[in-house]
UniProtKB/Swiss-Prot annotation:
This is Protein TRL14. The lineage of its organism: Viruses, Duplodnaviria, Heunggongvirae, Peploviricota, Herviviricetes. It comes from Human cytomegalovirus (strain AD169) (HHV-5). It is a single-pass membrane protein. Belongs to the RL11 family. Glycans are attached at residues 24, 64, 72.
Length: 186
């Protein structure tokens, strides 16, 4: 399988694969690294259970398990690119040569944007809960009303419950002249 190389349209690209496999028989691997051999060697992508790219200021690229796409190709991007299978050590090597005609080099800093994070709360974890509450059309003061009802019912229950308890007799002190009984019912 030929790696996809996209660059300035006036640049001519010469590439070839150097290994024992045919280009059109490349199978899809998992746990793949794309490596650019230069000084220093640069691991561009790590693929497996995750997708990690190492951005650089002088090369724009995108990768997956089977292809490496280089954007705005310049002579700086020429060299050896390797697709390395981490599980068994198998490698596919690609050599890229860029031949410049009478053209200007492509502009750096024009990499395509893959992911754009949103600053709003539409994609956050609790956004569905917030939307459900907003759609319920419950007035804001309803919680205060329910709290007032609960407190009122509790006070009424306490008042009514206090009348059901049998009253204790009230005792008064008798005059001093009755020595036998000190307390009596009033």
């Amino acid at each position: 399988m030929r790696p996809q190389l996209r660059g300035n349209q006036r640049n001519r690209i010469r590439w070839w694969q150097h290994n024992s496999k045919k280009c059109n028989q490349t199978e899809k691997w998992h746990n793949v690294d794309w490596i650019h051999y230069e000084y220093p060697t640069h691991k561009m992508c790590e693929l497996g259970n995750y997708h990690q790219t190492t951005p650089r200021h002088d090369i724009c690229f995108d990768c997956n398990d089977t292809s490496l796409t280089i954007y705005n190709l310049t002579t700086r991007n020429a060299g050896k690119y390797t697709r390395h299978h981490r599980d068994n050590g198998q490698e596919e090597n690609y050599y890229v040569t860029v031949l410049i005609g009478d053209t200007t080099l492509s502009t750096l800093g024009t990499c395509p944007v893959r992911y754009k994070e949103s600053r709003n709360t539409e994609n956050t974890i609790g956004s569905n809960i917030i939307k459900t509450i907003e759609k319920a059309n419950i007035p804001l003061g309803i919680h205060a009303v329910w709290a007032g009802v609960v407190v009122s019912v509790a006070l009424i229950a306490l008042y009514m419950g206090s009348h059901r308890i049998p009253k204790k007799p009230h005792y008064t002190k008798l005059p001093k002249y009755d020595p036998d009984e000190f307390w009596t019912k009033a």
